[in-house]
Amino acid sequence: MRKAALGCALAALCLLPTLTFAQIGFISSWLDMVTQTQSQQPHWITPLATTTPRLEQEFRYDIQWQTHNSGVTTDNYGVSKGLEIIPEKNVEVILAVPPYIVNNPDSPQDGFGDWQFLVKYRIAAGNEEHGNYILTAFYQISFPTGQYQEGVKSPVITPTLAYGKGFRNFDVQGTLGGGLPTGNNATIGRTILWNNTLQYRIRKKIWPETEFNFTHYYEGSHDGHSLLYITPGLVLGRFPIHNRFSFTFGGGFEIAATSFHPTNHIPILSIRFPF
């Protein structure tokens, strides 16, 4: 019995290097696929509020400080960002970390918001040498996991078409989609979401931008209203750290441009680690 156990242990030890090399080989092949996939699209930076049509691989953490018309301020830690990964050619998956919402003045009902994920499929793209454009489809769904009233009461599906076009150092990135609740329409309401970002690159790593974030509401408490935020901002990056690993950060300020606006004057901070 002891000899059999010893033999199994020795066999396992002999297999460990093989498994390790296999794992390293898998990771290396996967990262090579990611590099090739990203080389076939424009190399713009991801905007602050608009979801980029590019396929990106990074971990992202944002913070927003929202001021409501009532005078209450809300600190949003995370802003439904998280892990962005490219598992297959032309595909990206975003696994968001539920945001943590803090209401000021102090509230006993601070808590986590809804969890969501987003899948991108890149339909067509050309890098800077082959047209400098991209077209991507999104499928996003959020789940009512929020604590207290920090989320909505039903899952919300958001199909979206994203697009982008570059002209030398200037680019436009945009999305057009709709938020479709699977229930409680009278409370949650449906939305049309249209976002556009104008971006300019200076010295390769400095990206000033202006975003236009438009929402129109059907049903729900905001039925018939339209909302537009204009968001000037600046993103800096990508700063190499080691091999594929790099660092990007940016900030901006959302300003309501319509008479209807539940919140206004919203600072944004964004931190990203592309890999």
Predicted regions and their residues:
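Cleavable N-terminal export/targeting peptides
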Residues: 1-31
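Transmembrane beta-barrel domains of Gram-negative outer membranes and organellar outer membranes
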Residues: 22-275
